[in-house]
């Protein structure tokens, strides 16, 4: 399992984004260690964007570099950055978060690792599992009465994305692969590509 070390609120302030899913983190992001406290060099900007993307998806450096290498060799006619972000977006743990089963990427990863998630009717307990277009993701039936999961799902049910179809019984479908502009992350991925291309 990928581990993002350090206090989550502090990391949110340093990176300028909510990496823990806690509403209080949004209030603290602008205090103390914000992104703009000092002028960054070009390398510093590239490094910060990479750290932010890693934090969004909760992946470690080794995983991140693998996604870059796969994207670099893509034959789809898309930019390396677009393919890299799309691969991250369609990880199972991230789609569990997008489905509103979980309130943070950490919680989503735990749910997958503990065997609570089904993909096309089969248990998948690998957070990095790459979900294919048309796949159905659902919460294990015995876990659907869990109050925390119910609150997550009911509170955020209306928040959807054009490539995800939600149903009311803890079931979602990845209807198609996402376009880069549809993925709701504030990242300049070209800076990350430049960093890894050095």
From Swiss-Prot:
GO terms for molecular function: rRNA binding; structural constituent of ribosome. It holds the Pfam family Ribosomal_S4. It comes from the Bacteria. GO terms for cellular component: small ribosomal subunit. The keyword Ribonucleoprotein applies. Keywords: Ribonucleoprotein, Ribosomal protein, RNA-binding, rRNA-binding. Residues 90-152 form the S4 RNA-binding domain. The keyword rRNA-binding applies. SUPFAM superfamilies: Alpha-L RNA-binding motif. One of its GO terms (biological process) is translation. HAMAP family: Ribosomal_uS4_B. One of the primary rRNA binding proteins, it binds directly to 16S rRNA where it nucleates assembly of the body of the 30S subunit. With S5 and S12 plays an important role in translational accuracy. Belongs to the universal ribosomal protein uS4 family. Part of the 30S ribosomal subunit. Contacts protein S5. The interaction surface between S4 and S5 is involved in control of translational fidelity. This is Small ribosomal subunit protein uS4. The gene is rpsD.
